[in-house]
């Protein structure tokens, strides 16, 4: 299931990571469409797959850990997610990563916040994408009220791949990109669903050695 990272996309990721770590910007977004094959696999994940797969390891480890819990019709989604794990590993220099693929139906993480990691990859496969706001020096997530001015809120389109610097990033000065999961509770029931991939360092919160992988059907 694993394949070598696309050289072009790997170069884009390495350049993006270099820009973040050189202080040119705390965030980069790689735009891409979702193929028909991938969209069908996402639908299969929603219908038949687990609500959560949380694991850590190398991409090869993740393939072995996650494959038994995915329906065969959703394998193209897992293959894409593992491909992004490889790209993140190459760009970040980490050997192992934390991998979280989940179906979200609540207002989880709806408040604007920053992450206590160096670098995080986010990709929304289905539903509303992650929202973020620009900040000026000295502003914190707690001091912002972007809901008062919706024009301040930006949304990452589904399928696009985002790299966000966290609080531990070398140029973050203790504060990474301010972002949130978009609230879902105000939407019709049929629209209250996101499929989100999060990849970051293996020591990130929520990862326990004794439960690798953690799977919720």
Task: Go through the PLM ranges and name each one.
Residues 149-217:
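Catalytic core of Fe(II)/2-oxoglutarate
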Residues 30-33, 127, 165-167, 200:
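Structured loops at beta-to-helix junctions and adjacent beta-edge loops in soluble globular domains
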Residues 67-110, 114:
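Extracellular-facing segments of soluble proteins and assemblies that are Gly/Ser/Thr-biased and enriched
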Residues 106-160:
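Catalytic core of non-heme Fe(II) oxygenases with the double-stranded beta-helix
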Residues 81, 101, 125-131, 135, ...:
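Active-site environment of non-heme Fe oxygenases that use a 2-His-1-carboxylate facial triad
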Residues 44-47, 138-140, 211-217:
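Short intrinsically disordered coil segments
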Residues 1-79, 83:
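N-terminal auxiliary "cap/dimerization" subdomain that precedes the catalytic jelly-roll/cupin core
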Residues 16, 108-112, 184:
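Catalytic micro-motifs at enzyme active sites that drive phosphoryl/nucleotidyl and oxygen chemistry
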């Amino acid at each position: 299931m694993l394949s070598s990272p696309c050289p072009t996309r790997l170069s884009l990721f390495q350049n993006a990571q270099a820009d973040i770590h050189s202080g040119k910007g705390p965030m980069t977004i790689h735009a891409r469409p979702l193929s028909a094959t991938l969209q069908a696999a996402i639908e299969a994940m929603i219908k038949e797959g687990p609500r959560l797969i949380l694991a850590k390891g190398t991409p090869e480890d993740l393939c072995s850990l996650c494959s038994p819990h995915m329906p065969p019709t959703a394998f193209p989604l897992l293959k894409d997610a593992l491909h992004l794990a490889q790209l993140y590993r190459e760009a970040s220099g980490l050997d192992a990563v934390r991998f979280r693929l989940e179906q979200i139906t609540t207002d989880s993480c709806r408040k604007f916040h920053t992450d206590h990691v160096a670098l995080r990859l986010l990709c929304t496969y289905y539903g509303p994408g992650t929202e973020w706001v620009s900040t000026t020096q000295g502003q914190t997530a707690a001091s912002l009220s972007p809901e008062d001015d919706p024009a301040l809120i930006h949304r990452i389109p589904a399928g696009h791949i985002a790299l966000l610097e966290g609080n531990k990033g070398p140029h973050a000065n203790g504060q990474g990109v301010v972002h949130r999961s978009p609230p879902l509770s105000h939407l019709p029931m049929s629209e209250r669903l996101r499929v989100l991939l999060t990849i970051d360092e293996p020591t990130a919160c929520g990862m326990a050695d004794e439960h690798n992988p953690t799977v919720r059907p």
